[in-house]
């Protein structure tokens, strides 16, 4: 009887250890899936995009399982701090302000920002004075407009899709967002124009996009960085990049 009980106890302990190992091997990524080509919902209501493919490649290197969870952009960092998710990969600029709240992986994408409007509506960035410009709420683009262009009215949106629709319908004059994202709109619309040059202010747009991780989780940051180096070395990063942005 003792032998049976001991065997059963060992079995239960082993099962608990195995269950914990499975839980530890799943990395829960939060993202805001209205930001093509980085993250968006496909026709089957599944999250797709550059960030998703990259995260899957990193998880493969770490021998871990990825899961992806759609959240509003301005809730990503709070959700990390409440430990609802392990990481956030959502075209997020690495900035000093964000580094006060979370840690980041090494940069995985170099970024710039751009103003876009309907053709012939806004001549240049100086002409934005007194205009209404759409931005995503909680984004560095919003901070840039408020602090660097106080003469411009910043109009916050929960998603850039909503801002784009309002611009097309004349409710706002321009949209300010990541260059790669607004470039997607030009593929579908022929009446758009860039307003001035790209903006690369490092205070707001950092030193590229990084994967945000809750402070104190240095182990995950190190694993992400090691895996990022690996996928860049083996050519997988380039394959993913070319899939979405071309050579």
Segments from the language model and where they lie:
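Flexible hinge/capping segments at coil-to-helix
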Residues: 105, 117-133
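Extracytoplasmic small-molecule ligand-binding "clamshell" domains
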Residues: 22-91, 234
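Periplasmic-binding protein-like
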Residues: 33, 109-116, 186-226, 247
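Short helices/loops that flank or line small-molecule/ion binding pockets
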Residues: 60, 69-70, 74-86, 101-103, ...
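A ligand-binding cleft/hinge motif common to bilobed small-molecule-binding domains
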Residues: 90-100, 147, 173-205
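Extended ligand-binding regions for polar small-molecule ligands
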Residues: 53-61, 127, 131-132, 137-140, ...
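Ligand-binding clefts/hinges and TM-proximal coupling segments of bilobed small-molecule sensing domains
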Residues: 144-157, 193-200, 226-247
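Short beta-strand-to-loop elements that line the ligand-binding cleft
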Residues: 65-72, 135, 152-159
């Amino acid at each position: 009887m003792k032998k049976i009980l001991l065997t059963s106890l060992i079995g239960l302990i082993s099962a608990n250890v195995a269950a914990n190992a499975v839980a530890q091997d799943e990395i829960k990524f939060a993202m805001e899936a209205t930001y093509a080509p980085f993250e968006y919902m496909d026709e089957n209501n599944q999250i797709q995009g550059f960030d998703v493919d990259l995260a899957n490649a990193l998880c493969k290197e770490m021998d871990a399982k990825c899961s992806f969870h759609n959240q509003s952009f301005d809730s990503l960092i709070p959700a990390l701090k409440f430990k609802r998710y392990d990481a956030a990969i959502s075209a997020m600029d690495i900035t000093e302000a964000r580094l006060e709240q979370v840690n980041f992986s090494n940069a995985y994408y170099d970024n710039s920002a751009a103003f876009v409007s309907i053709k012939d509506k806004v001549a240049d960035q100086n002409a934005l004075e007194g205009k209404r410009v759409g931005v995503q709420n909680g984004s560095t683009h919003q901070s840039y407009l408020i602090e660097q262009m106080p003469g411009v009215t910043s109009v916050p949106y929960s998603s850039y899709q909503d801002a784009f629709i309002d611009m097309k319908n004349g409710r706002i004059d321009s949209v300010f967002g990541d260059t790669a994202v607004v470039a997607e709109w030009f593929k579908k619309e022929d009446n758009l124009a860039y307003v001035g040059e790209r903006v690369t202010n490092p205070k707001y747009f950092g030193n590229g996009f990084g994967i945000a991780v809750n402070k104190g989780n240095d182990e995950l940051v190190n694993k992400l960085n090691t895996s990022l180096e690996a996928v860049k070395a083996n050519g997988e990063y380039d394959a993913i990049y070319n899939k979405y942005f071309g050579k």
